[in-house]
């Protein structure tokens, strides 16, 4: 047994060393196969001799049992955001404020990693808890997922009690590999590495997180008591010595001109990095000076984040293609010579509508400027007429639908051209894709490519046909093995039990969104009652306007639609509202019977989760602020709704006040 104990210690040392070389130094000394062999040896020993499994074992990196949900936990000290600078003038004003308060200053410049802020707590040197930033006061406990990140030490090199903060991110190579895998499985791709990192860290099954190959850079420590550091630069050096991964592309500079030089350098070199950055963080380096400057309610006075402007690149417009949405809107898309924008290769970009093409004088063959709106959605900003070739072609939208050949129309008051043929193939396919989407019937495994195959094979012609699919229909399809078919049929069966509002939204009735579907389902309770409703009745319902009322009645009066509903009934698809009616709920008097509006960005829950919880307490959640509104819950960046509420003297809660009230009810 002593020999086995010695071997376990040896395996710990080897695996930790090889992991550090691979994930932190990016300089592995052994092949992956050697690491895997040693890891499996340790796993086997721990399975046969559980007494040898420790909290800092390298096997923890593999992930553990799936969790039911993430607990909300208060931060010991708030995770504040930074003020933003967008240009040189903003930075010089920041520098002036600093010097007026504390005199001469040295700055620390660090890359702003485009990821997810996390807080890591260590007790006696062991990693015990990891939280997301959340709203800065309360975060989610994602400890098990963070343990799978090799750049996070499970045990520090010194037995300290400390809390460090950093940015979890997905390296570009991990992002490309993940999206390649998703594409093979006909799953929706992640838009960028940041979204991929955030989604990976919120997996309830840490084994899935482990497969995503995330990393982290630590950038600060909460309490310097056990640190012999007098500056930010010395603190980062101390963190390195303790086994943490900090970003080495940092620099101490003596003045604001040095800051500007650092920004210029990394603005031009950011694409050479193996991870995404979205700016530069500038901090007063001296810790005593930081203490002297202090904090505002939202951010430290001694630091600022310079945000990179949206990157613009020039490429060639090769062609313009059209896509037809489920409501018949015809959208032009630019086909581009592939070009790298904000870290990803772009070959297609939105042109929105015909008016934009003409207003910006965009022609096929032009050199065009492309950027990503919010570093996510590619769009063509403008053409460059001085580079225009002689054979550039002025684009004219077609008069007939490229899918079905029906004449296109422009409805008064709209900029978009629209195909109004209800049997248009492109619209039908898009309608099927919408029907199975998450907020509609939520049929997992029915991706775009599978739906296209099913439609082209004439196995489905309308949404009801989905519930008639059999194993024999699905097995011959591309990339559809037995297990995938079994899972898909189970998902289809499960979708039959969805509540009425899911079905209503899934049917794709024009102007009828998620919220209005919920309102109608709760009001009428069954599809049969809805089939008898009049336009005059609908417009009397709060949150149902004239357009929605007219659209719903016209849709449900159509004989083809009534036949479709019967076809769904024949396969026992639920047509009844399964939720609790707001009027029947005896909720807490703090919420019951009140009309509440949510506005701004929430951090501790989604808007949908907040709405459902409020409804469970008997509140009525509406989308607009009126004199009848009782409370407005204002998240981050709340806009005109908050302003209107203030002018009407309506009670306003912050997100934290709302969460506190929830906690009071639950305690």
UniProtKB/Swiss-Prot annotation:
Sites where the protein binds NAD(+): 32-36, 81-82, 110, 133, 167, 283, 307
UniProt entry keywords in alphabetical sequence: DNA damage, DNA repair, DNA replication, Ligase, Magnesium, Manganese, Metal-binding, NAD, Zinc
Cofactors (names): Mg(2+); Mn(2+)
BRCT domain residues: 586-667
Pfam families the record matches: BRCT, DNA_ligase_aden, DNA_ligase_OB, DNA_ligase_ZBD, HHH_2
Catalytic activity: NAD(+) + (deoxyribonucleotide)n-3'-hydroxyl + 5'-phospho-(deoxyribonucleotide)m = (deoxyribonucleotide)n+m + AMP + beta-nicotinamide D-nucleotide
MF (Gene Ontology): DNA binding; DNA ligase (NAD+) activity; metal ion binding
E.C. no: 6.5.1.2
Catalytic center residues: 112
Keyword presence, Ligase: yes
Phosphoprotein recorded as keyword: no
CDD domains, A to Z: BRCT_DNA_ligase_like, LIGANc
GO cellular component: cytosol
SMART domains named among the record's database cross-references: BRCT (SM00292), HhH1 (SM00278), LIGANc (SM00532)
List of residues binding Zn(2+): 401, 404, 419, 424
Family, similarity comment: Belongs to the NAD-dependent DNA ligase family. LigA subfamily.
Protein name stated in the entry: DNA ligase
Species name: Staphylococcus aureus (strain MRSA252)
């Amino acid at each position: 047994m002593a020999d086995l104990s010695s071997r376990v210690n040896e395996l710990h040392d080897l695996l930790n060393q090889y992991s550090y070389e691979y994930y932190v130094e990016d300089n592995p000394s052994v092949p992956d196969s050697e690491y895997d062999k040693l890891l499996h040896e340790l796993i086997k020993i721990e399975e046969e001799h559980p007494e040898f499994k420790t909290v800092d074992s390298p096997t923890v990196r593999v992930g553990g049992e799936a969790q039911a949900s993430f607990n909300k936990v208060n931060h010991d000290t708030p995770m504040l955001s930074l003020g933003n600078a967008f240009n040189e003038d903003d930075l010089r004003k920041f520098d002036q404020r600093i010097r007026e308060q504390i005199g001469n200053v040295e700055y620390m410049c660090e890359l702003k990693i485009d990821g997810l802020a996390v807080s890591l707590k260590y007790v006696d040197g062991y990693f015990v808890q990891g939280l997301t930033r959340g709203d800065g006061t309360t975060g989610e406990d994602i400890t098990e997922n963070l343990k799978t990140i090799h750049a996070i030490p499970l045990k520090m090199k010194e037995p300290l009690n400390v809390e460090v903060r950093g940015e979890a991110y997905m390296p570009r190579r991990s992002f490309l590999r993940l999206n390649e895998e998703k594409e093979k499985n006909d799953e929706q791709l992640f838009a960028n590495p940041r979204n991929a990192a955030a989604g990976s860290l919120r997996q309830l099954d840490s084994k899935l997180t482990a497969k995503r190959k995330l990393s982290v850079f630590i950038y600060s420590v909460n309490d310097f008591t056990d640190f012999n550091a007098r500056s930010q630069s010395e603190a980062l050096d101390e963190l390195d010595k303790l086994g943490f991964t900090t970003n080495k592309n940092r620099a101490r500079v003596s003045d604001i001109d040095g800051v500007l030089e650092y920004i210029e350098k990394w603005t031009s070199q950011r694409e050479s990095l193996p991870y995404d950055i979205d700016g530069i963080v500038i901090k007063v380096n001296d810790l005593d000076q930081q203490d002297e400057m202090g904090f505002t309610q939202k951010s430290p006075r001694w630091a600022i984040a310079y945000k990179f402007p949206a990157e613009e690149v020039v490429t060639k417009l090769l062609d313009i293609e059209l896509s037809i949405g489920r409501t018949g809107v015809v959208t032009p898309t630019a086909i581009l010579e592939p070009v790298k924008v904000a870290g990803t290769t772009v070959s297609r970009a939105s042109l929105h509508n015909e008016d934009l093409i003409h207003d910006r004088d965009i022609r096929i063959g032009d050199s065009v400027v492309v950027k990503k709106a919010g570093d996510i959605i590619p769009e063509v900003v403008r053409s460059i007429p001085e580079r225009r070739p002689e054979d550039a072609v002025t684009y004219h939208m077609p008069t007939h639908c490229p899918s079905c050949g029906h004449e296109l129309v422009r409805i008064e008051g709209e900029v978009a051209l629209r195909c109004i043929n209800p049997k248009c193939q492109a619209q039908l396919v898009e309608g099927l894709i919408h029907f199975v989407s998450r907020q509609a019937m939520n049929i997992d495994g029915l991706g775009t490519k599978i739906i296209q195959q099913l439609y082209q094979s004439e196995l489905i012609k309308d949404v009801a046909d989905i519930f008639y699919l059999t194993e024999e229909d699905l097995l011959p399809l591309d990339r559809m093995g037995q297990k995938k078919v079994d899972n898909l049929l189970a998902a289809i069966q499960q979708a039959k039990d969805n509540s009425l509002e899911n079905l209503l939204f899934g049917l794709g009735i024009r102007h009828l969104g998620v919220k209005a579907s919920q309102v109608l389902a709760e009001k009428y309770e069954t599809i049969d009652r809805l089939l008898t409703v009049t336009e005059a009745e609908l417009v009397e319902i709060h949150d149902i306007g004239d357009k929605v009322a007219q659209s719903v009645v016209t849709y449900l009066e159509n004989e083809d639609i009534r036949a479709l509903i019967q076809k769904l009934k024949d396969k026992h698809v639920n047509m009844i509202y399964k939720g609790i009616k707001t009027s029947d709920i005896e909720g807490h008097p703090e919420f019951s019977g009140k009309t509440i509006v949510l506005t701004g960005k929430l951090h501790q829950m989604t808007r949908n989760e907040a709405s459902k919880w409020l409804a469970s307490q008997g509140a009525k959640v509406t989308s607009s602020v009126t004199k009848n509104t009782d409370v407005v819950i204002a998240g981050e960046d709340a806009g005109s709704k908050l302003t209107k509420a203030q002018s009407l003297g309506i009670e306003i809660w912050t997100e934290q006040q709302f969460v506190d009230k929830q906690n009071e009810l639950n305690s």
